[in-house]
Amino acid sequence: MARVTVEDCVDKVPNRFELVLLAAHRAREISAGAAITVDRDNDKNPVVSLREIADETQSADDLRERLIEANQTQIEVDEPEEDQMALLMGAESDRPVEDDMSEERLLRALMEAQGQG
């Protein structure tokens, strides 16, 4: 039965590789619970999908669009933070400069500030 169905579909989708992609996608839709547009006649989902394409109850163009939509992914691009953006653009950041001061130097500076030095 499937061989005859493939021969019937070649008129609607001339490229057999594309036909396989479309029929497989439609079979997955049927497995996911989509309504069948032809009588099942105890056939499995791939054969039903080929029969739908052959009978033109499923348009090849519509199937193609749904296949493309199903395979498209949206990639979110994270924007860098403002500080990182400034550094990437070559500007200096607004952060205070951190001074690596030893504990001894810090105590001396505090004592000098208080006038005990």
Swiss-Prot record:
Annotated catalysed reactions: RNA(n) + a ribonucleoside 5'-triphosphate = RNA(n+1) + diphosphate
Keyword field contains Transferase: yes
Pfam family, one: RNA_pol_Rpb6
Single Gene Ontology BP annotation: DNA-templated transcription
Superkingdom to which the source organism belongs: Bacteria
Gene Ontology molecular-function annotations: DNA binding; DNA-directed RNA polymerase activity
UniProt enzyme class: transferase
EC number: 2.7.7.6
Keywords from the named record: DNA-directed RNA polymerase, Nucleotidyltransferase, Transcription, Transferase
SUPFAM superfamilies, per the entry: RPB6/omega subunit-like
GO cellular component term, pick one: DNA-directed RNA polymerase complex
Subunit structure: The RNAP catalytic core consists of 2 alpha, 1 beta, 1 beta' and 1 omega subunit. When a sigma factor is associated with the core the holoenzyme is formed, which can initiate transcription.
Primary role: Promotes RNA polymerase assembly. Latches the N- and C-terminal regions of the beta' subunit thereby facilitating its interaction with the beta and alpha subunits.
Protein family: Belongs to the RNA polymerase subunit omega family.
Protein name in the entry: DNA-directed RNA polymerase subunit omega
Origin species: Ruegeria pomeroyi (strain ATCC 700808 / DSM 15171 / DSS-3) (Silicibacter pomeroyi)
